[in-house]
Amino acid sequence: LAAYWIVQIVFSFLLSFVMMIIKAKELAPILFTEQESMTEMEFQTVMDTVNQIAGEFYVQYQLECATASALCLILVMGVMFWQDRKREAAGQAEPAGQGAPIGRVAMTGRMEPARAVPISKYMLLLGLGVSFCLAANCLVGMTELAFADEAYQEAAAVLYGPSFPMQVLCSGLIIPLSEELFYRGLVFKRFRERIGFLGAAFISSFVFSTSHGNVVQALYTIGLGMLLSYAYEKYGSFKAPLFLHVVANMTSLICTRTGAFDWLMKNKPWMAVLAVAGTFVGTTMYVMIQKTGEEKADKPAKE
């Protein structure tokens, strides 16, 4: 956790410096005025103007800035993830107890090693990701919680403001990779070896949810986080939670872009139907994934 936040703080500082350079032409006339002849109030007004210009620039490109930060985190967390897997392969991990039989989610003990899973089994994750996203968003829409959460409204404006290709690149691919490397690849995996699946899944999901900064996304991501941890547990490969995360995010982006969510908000009966259908399909996918670990593969998969 410390490394994660340190990287973010350092990168935010560097990003602020870069932003000041980019806006230097606009800020120069303000900064290089006759400061000696200024009153304290006039100087404060100048600094407020500088902060406002820098702040508006950051808000305008907030998703891009978050993606740049995510790329930096991918490099750092990727190295840590690789080192963990290397130690794990060398048998240096510290299990809390005996492992569980294949196909069961253990409460304690080692997580099952990575193993080859047919591509068809990843279609179950596709169904789970789409159904969870639709059902969860419909439930949020029916309760109108999103409209009461100003922090969520601001976050939504940032997420869905840029062009759609930029949304796909940032929110659909890069940010999910950085989040999965940290929350599942490091936090979940490390706690998994010491306190078992349920504790590790809850801790990683809770930290994951609180990082989003608003009630709506916190409720959504704590549920998604538990499913992502479960996918990692059952498939034994980092590719599983990453794929599920990308599917869920892409579903949200596509439905927002096409106006599907707006249409559902105007047709509440259909929203209720989709919430029930999504829950049913998601539950079915969950049960089918439960059987994934029971099928032994001929050869192990690579992380």
Where are these regions (language model features)?
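Hydrophobic alpha-helical transmembrane segments
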Residues: 1-2, 122-127, 165-169, 198-203, ...
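Functionally important transmembrane alpha-helices
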Residues: 5-13, 205, 210, 217-270
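Alpha-helical transmembrane segments in multi-pass membrane proteins
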Residues: 5-87, 120, 124
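Juxtamembrane helix-loop-helix connectors linking adjacent transmembrane helices
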Residues: 22, 26-31, 47-58, 88-97, ...
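Membrane-embedded alpha-helical segments of multi-pass membrane proteins
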Residues: 67-72, 165, 169, 219-226, ...
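Hydrophobic core of alpha-helical transmembrane segments in multi-pass integral membrane proteins
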Residues: 69-81, 128-137, 271-291
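Membrane-interface helix/loop boundary segments of multi-pass membrane proteins
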Residues: 178-203, 230-237
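C-terminal membrane module of polytopic membrane proteins
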Residues: 246-303
